[in-house]
Amino acid sequence: MAAATGTRKKKTPRPGQWKLWLLYTAGFVPAVWTFYLGATGQLGADPVKTFEHLLGLWALRFLILTLLVTPIRDLTGITLLRYRRALGLLAFYYALMHFTTYMVLDQGLNLSAIITDIVRRPFITIGMISLALLVPLALTSNNWSIRKLGRRWSSLHKLVYIAIAGSAVHFLMSVKSWPAEPVIYAAIVAALLLWRLARPYLRTRKPALRPRGEAIALRK
């Protein structure tokens, strides 16, 4: 009897997939460069704190870029939705590296000291909450989760707004005074959140602002 053989269809990469990989590659360049600066003694008098700070700063930057996708589309018509998931995941990876640096290099895996910091130092508490909120977003940033969760997926990913607000507050509270840098980032975050609140009203006035679908946070 002749055995029936099935033919497997080879998965062909989607058009423009290389752009996503290029984005991921470029996204990790700051981490590699910062690690190089630290390894070669170019991060100043307190390299651990500087390394930790820069990783956290890049996490906030990528969160801002993630939320900028929608205003850019609304105001210019340029659609970057396919890159939003990658930007959101990069933000999570940097936030995780930021916390890992604090936990391993700063505190030396002293769990008692880490827990004490989280409980007693408000800016660390807020930072930890923000990181915790990003975890389910990163874990569900895939097509399977979108299909499985349905409408709940969009509701879940609205947590990104709380996470980015907490990240901005964490940055502001981590400095003894308020220099320009954290204030500028906080202002950008505030503007993005205000845009999100005003967007439904703007869409009723300008039909062009109505997107085909509401993609939140880390979704492609």
UniProtKB/Swiss-Prot annotation:
The chain crosses the membrane at residues 20-40, 52-72, 86-106, 122-142, 153-173, 175-195. GO terms for molecular function: electron transfer activity; FMN binding; heme binding; metal ion binding; oxidoreductase activity, acting on diphenols and related substances as donors. One of its GO terms (biological process) is protein repair. Its main location: membrane. InterPro entries: Fe3_Rdtase_TM_dom (IPR013130), MsrQ-like (IPR022837). Keywords: Cell inner membrane, Cell membrane, Electron transport, Flavoprotein, FMN, Heme, Iron, Membrane, Metal-binding, Transmembrane, Transmembrane helix, Transport. The keyword Cell inner membrane applies. One of its GO terms (cellular component) is plasma membrane. Its cofactor is FMN; heme b. Binds 1 FMN per subunit. The keyword NADP does not apply. It is found in: Cell inner membrane. It is a multi-pass membrane protein. Belongs to the MsrQ family. Heterodimer of a catalytic subunit (MsrP) and a heme-binding subunit (MsrQ). Part of the MsrPQ system that repairs oxidized periplasmic proteins containing methionine sulfoxide residues (Met-O), using respiratory chain electrons. Thus protects these proteins from oxidative-stress damage caused by reactive species of oxygen and chlorine generated by the host defense mechanisms. MsrPQ is essential for the maintenance of envelope integrity under bleach stress, rescuing a wide series of structurally unrelated periplasmic proteins from methionine oxidation. This is Protein-methionine-sulfoxide reductase heme-binding subunit MsrQ. It comes from Brucella canis (strain ATCC 23365 / NCTC 10854 / RM-666). The gene is msrQ.
